[in-house]
Amino acid sequence: MPTQPQEKRSFLQFLKSFVGIVRVLQILLGAGLWVTIAANKYEGSIHFVLFVAVLFWLLTLAIFILTLLDKQDLVPIVGGERWLLSNLIHDVVATLLYLSTIGIMIYKTQKNSYCNLDVYKHHCLYKVYLTASVFACLTAAVYLLSGIYCSCRKCRGERTVV
């Protein structure tokens, strides 16, 4: 029985930490992006945006759960002492791919800006793409913030994420 309060404290300690808050934001903003796109008609390069959003949403969810449960030692090759470096690489790659999704979403938003008029009566994806652009920008910013934080911890010689 004495281990349960420590586990709860560990959960709360992680959830209240900078990394815990950032991971929750990454999960929520990433979900907002792919739900916004998936709930509407999409074509062409938007498939790549959806792929990046869903891929990193799933990876971030897995990293969040493993870190929350303190089970990163069970992950072969990238776990244990390499967990901080693995998180750093994940965040940097996510930031870079999200930057490309921002470009795609801004291009699509500008391409559909003609239908933002009151007299235009057909289905318009301008507001959907604009919302997705905002989600992509916010998500990239949060991944960048997390990457900077992990790199600072790595440079100081620390080996844990929290």
Curated annotation (Swiss-Prot):
A cellular component term, taken from the record's GO annotations: membrane
Domain MARVEL per the UniProt entry, residue ranges: 14-155
Pfam families (UniProt xref): MARVEL
Plastid recorded as keyword: no
Cellular location(s): Membrane; Nucleus
A GO biological-process term: myelination
Residue stretches in coiled coil: none
Residues exposed to the Extracellular side: 39-47, 108-127
Membrane topology: Multi-pass membrane protein
Protein name: MARVEL domain-containing protein 1
